[in-house]
Amino acid sequence: MVEMALRHVYKKYDNAEKYSVTDFNLEIADREFIVFVGPSGCGKSTTLRMIAGLEDISEGELLIGDKVMNDVAPKDRDIAMVFQNYALYPHMTVFDNMAFGLKLRKYDKAEIKKRVENAAQILGLSEYLDRKPAALSGGQRQRVALGRAIVRDAKVFLMDEPLSNLDAKLRVAMRAEIAKLHQRLNTTTIYVTHDQTEAMTMADRIVIMKDGIIQQIGSPKEVYDTPSNVFVAGFIGSPAMNFFKVTLKDGYITNDGGLKVKLPEGRNKILVEKGYEGKQVIFGIRPEDIHSERVVLDATPDACVKSTVVVSELLGAETMLYTKIGDTEFVSRVDARDYHKPGEEVELAFNLNKAHFFDVESEEVIR
């Protein structure tokens, strides 16, 4: 059983003008699967390396259990880490690669054999223990790297973009493998990725970062349904949320390009009470909340817009329909049968009960 906490953690490198990580606060429950996600340079890997002890903490505290770990050596933190690079020894067999850390720690041969064979069985590597890394596929090499961490029997697993070197199909398969592995091992896991799909499919909770600052912490459903700001709303979800700068007036939102839709009474009331009547707001709506079915168009005439097709992408079961109103281009996820040629005019209905509104200046959500 292990709980972790990062309290007011900062990281600033020597001679740097800005902090790489600013006031990072997070409580992690025992056996929780936490994902740090954000664009390159947001501080997610730096934070992971501070937890591992590979980077010093400039300010703040890291606790594992009830012990402050700031000055504890990496080897004494009872942490196992999996890196983006497999870092396998090419001259060693799979068995020896997985056993290497245990040998350094002077475990006896029987215990090493037991741990390696158990990890190999979990990862489906039992028949490959005598092979060298060159004889393995990319997915098998990544499993060996995971096995090297598993044999440690550590309290905490840290994973720094472990799937980024794999092709798209293999990444999907390995996502499921890591999720199943976490359930089997019952460990606390912290996983770093720039891929929001990995974060959404694997995490118990997601920590979304930008410029070294936490933007939002929540379950995948929470960050998808109730994003805290424009950055989170645009980062989580694929395709990304559409944004329009609009003016609120007499229950309608409009823009210069010709967008005009009527808000549900409850949504309009919130915006008016917050002082946005007659002012600009950012209107966000996800592609899956824009509809082209005639039954929806007929039922919601005040939420319909006419737009011009830019391009249609047929993806089998659905079509990504890129259209524009005036100069504003947006994307809708519609039925595969709604395939249109560029230049055609189409009518679309916004599900305004699923709309999001943000302040123009702060870009924070309006609730």
Set out the residue ranges of the language-model regions.
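Conserved coupling/switch loops of ABC nucleotide-binding domains, chiefly the family-specific signature
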Residues: 58-61, 111, 211, 355
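Conserved hydrophobic segment flanking the Walker A/P-loop of ABC-type ATPase nucleotide-binding domains
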Residues: 26-28, 350
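ABC ATPase nucleotide-binding domains
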Residues: 74-231, 235
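A short, flexible loop at the N-terminus of ABC-type nucleotide-binding domains that lies
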Residues: 1-6, 11-23, 72-73, 106
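ATP-binding/catalytic-site motifs of ATP-hydrolyzing domains
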Residues: 61-63, 67-68, 213
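The feature captures the beta-strand-to-loop junction immediately N-terminal to the Walker
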Residues: 37-39
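Glycine/charge-rich catalytic "coupling/switch" loops of P-loop NTPases
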Residues: 252, 256-309, 338-367
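Helix-to-loop junction immediately C-terminal to a conserved catalytic motif
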Residues: 52
